[in-house]
Amino acid sequence: MMHGLHSEDEASSPVDQSCFPLTIDFSLANPSQGRIILFEEGTSLRGYALLVPYWSNEFGGTLVVVDELFVTPMARNRGIARTFFRFLGEHWPFEAVALTLEVSPGNTGARRLYESLGFTCRRNSLLTYRFPE
């Protein structure tokens, strides 16, 4: 499914797919630093979210980054992501003060969903510096 997200997301940086198993292994071994939540309907996997908590001085508490959120195309518009955010608000194991996420400019459906849930745009831009290998 990680392949699906990164193949659809035109705004995403190129991703080395060999990182996918490393991310899964790290999240399983270090749940306080990353969690993967799977979205299931019956016995079918319909999507996933990758969550990364960290302390934010600006927010005065734990901020949870929804680093990746993907619902399979055939399962979209069925309330899966909305249900996930409701679940997250009720069952996140750490005391969090806010959620943050990125959305691709062309993903208007996801943006509408996030705004309907109360997410707002920040004035700051996200910049990234990648360390040389």
Pin down the residues of each PLM region:
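Alpha-helical elements of Rossmann-like donor-binding domains used by nucleotide-donor carbohydrate transfer enzymes
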Residues: 1, 22-23, 44, 83, ...
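Conserved acetyl-CoA binding element of GNAT-fold acetyltransferases
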Residues: 61-73
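Conserved beta-strand in the GNAT
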Residues: 36-38, 44-53
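A short helix-loop-beta-strand connector motif used in the catalytic cores of GNAT acetyltransferases and
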Residues: 25-38, 65
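Conserved GNAT acetyl-CoA-binding A-motif
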Residues: 85, 92-103
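Conserved acetyl-CoA-binding loop-helix of GNAT-fold acetyltransferases
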Residues: 71, 77-90, 112-116
